[in-house]
């Protein structure tokens, strides 16, 4: 069962068709977070992002939350993880993020977009692509 608010009536529209994101979206989502974070970086006020980004599609645990933050997200949702594994994934993720921050003596604000600023795809060396042998030409 799914629900989406109708913008005209402002009432919920209920249906049985629901799409669920998942961990398979993590690399793609991190890529686009980094791209958008970099594009918006010049549009800041007092060093704070004018448009905070939310990482969605793929966060399963605290490590994934950290990956989203490093890619440029200011917040991360974990709806698919909660649906599949229950709300306990949230407290475990929070603990993992807290432990990571403490072990590196840093704060969340210092992580946001840090990986997006390191290297762009155009700057990466051309890698061997062993998977190409499995693709029809």
Which residues fall in each region the model found?
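Generic structural signal for well-ordered alpha-helices
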Residues: 30-37, 65, 90-94
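Glycine/Thr-rich beta-alpha phosphate-binding loop at enzyme active sites
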Residues: 1-46
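Glycine-rich beta-to-alpha transition loops that act as phosphate-gripper elements at the mouths
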Residues: 46-63
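Hydrophobic faces of well-ordered beta-strands that scaffold small-molecule active sites
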Residues: 36, 52-57, 76-78, 107
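Extended, intrinsically disordered, low-complexity segments
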Residues: 26, 43, 95-137
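Glycine- and other small-residue-rich loops at beta-strand/loop junctions that grip anionic moieties
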Residues: 21-25, 54-58, 79-81
